[in-house]
Amino acid sequence: MTENVPQGQITMPLQQGGAREISPQALAVADYLRSHKLLKQRPGILNGKRSDFFRVKRAIRALEDPKYKQLQSKPNSKLPPINSRNEAISIFRLMPINQMALRVDKLPTQTALMMKQKPEQGVPVLQVNPQQEFGDDMYYTWFYNPVPLTTYLYGALGVAAIFAGVLFPLWPIFLRQGVWYLSVGMLGLIGVFFGIALVRLVIFVLTWPTVKPGIWIFPNLFADVGFVDSFIPLWAWHGTPERDLLPQKFKNKKKKKNAGTVIESKEPPRKLTKEEKQKQKEANAQMEQMQAAFQTQLSSFATQMQQIKEMSDSGIDPQIIAAQLQAQYPPDKQAAIKLENEQAQAKLDERIRELAAQIQDKTNANKTGDKIEEVADKENKEAPKRIVTLEDANDE
């Protein structure tokens, strides 16, 4: 099976419809990938239910694994042959075509909460993407969930337990006593669980009006987690902040990332002196003058461009138009424009240095760097709008 599929992203719209017959090759590939260790599947929440998802590049690695060739070489194997990456991508396309695995997107926690989803710690909320693409870092989730062998074993054990319960009158006395003690112990555990739930509700009701938004003890008590994780953390405020839903490793990364940042002060802004207000007015006036000059030059260029367009539409030779443009910008005028731009840039740099010196004198050292960068960035962003270079004029 050879198909020239380019590497990277391949778009395929999601097909809507009812149940369809699954090809034997797709079923064999799904059985091979479903439990492969190279897939590194993780749990996610799709439509309120747990669903394993994985990256496309890991599925391609699993299909290129030598173990696949060994299984495919067996006489009764239904696995299609794979000899290149393009063929591996073509084989993986059988998953969305047969709707056994579809592309999904991981939703940000805030978006999931707005959609009334309930993300859990380390378990992101997933959403099916209508465009089924095959980029290396894209995610796919399984819609093919074969019944494992353990399910049949549990079913057989359930039938055996029911049969043994029917024969309870025939049990020996020591077995009957053991079952009675076990039943009492289980009822006691259930009672303790309901007692904890009642106590945490009472504590929340008492703390909600006094210490808003209220406190829950064992906030994960009813979450879909393990027994030990149900009691961790010990308490939490009502509501689930976005940071609390992140795994611990992401919290540590955030701490390291924000370790060197300076916390902004909550002090009220300092009032400007008369001298500073006067300098600010002068600076604003200079800015307005430069903007007016820029608008004048822009209008002039627009007029010239309109004239050039009219000349071009009338059939004038382009060489004549170029000669006229050259006449409008003789060498002495070009030198004057260049000198004017250099002077404007020098004034701009001088103004930035003055503002930096004022901030250095009037503020503490922790805030100086941020404010200088803010002023410099603002001035530099405005500079291209005020200075029209000769190259831009010639390009137009």
UniProtKB/Swiss-Prot annotation:
Recite the UniProt keywords alphabetically.
Endoplasmic reticulum, Membrane, Protein transport, Translocation, Transmembrane, Transmembrane helix, Transport
Q: Which domain of life is it from?
A: Eukaryota
Predominant localisation class: endoplasmic reticulum
Question: In which compartments does the protein localize?
Answer: Endoplasmic reticulum membrane
Q: Which GO terms describe its biological process?
A: post-translational protein targeting to membrane, translocation
Query: Which intervals carry biased composition (Basic and acidic residues)?
Result: 264-282, 368-389
Q: Name one GO cellular component term.
A: endoplasmic reticulum membrane
Residue intervals annotated with topology Cytoplasmic: 1-154, 200-396
UniProt xrefs under Pfam families:
Sec62
Region annotated Disordered sits at 252-288, 360-396
Say yes or no: keyword 4Fe-4S present. no
Give the transmembrane ranges.
Answer: 155-175, 179-199
Q: Which family does it belong to?
A: Belongs to the SEC62 family.
Subunit-structure text: Part of a complex that contains SEC61, SEC62, SEC63, SEC66 and SEC72.
Q: What is this protein called?
A: Translocation protein SEC62
The upper taxonomy is:
Eukaryota, Fungi, Dikarya, Ascomycota, Saccharomycotina
- The gene is SEC62
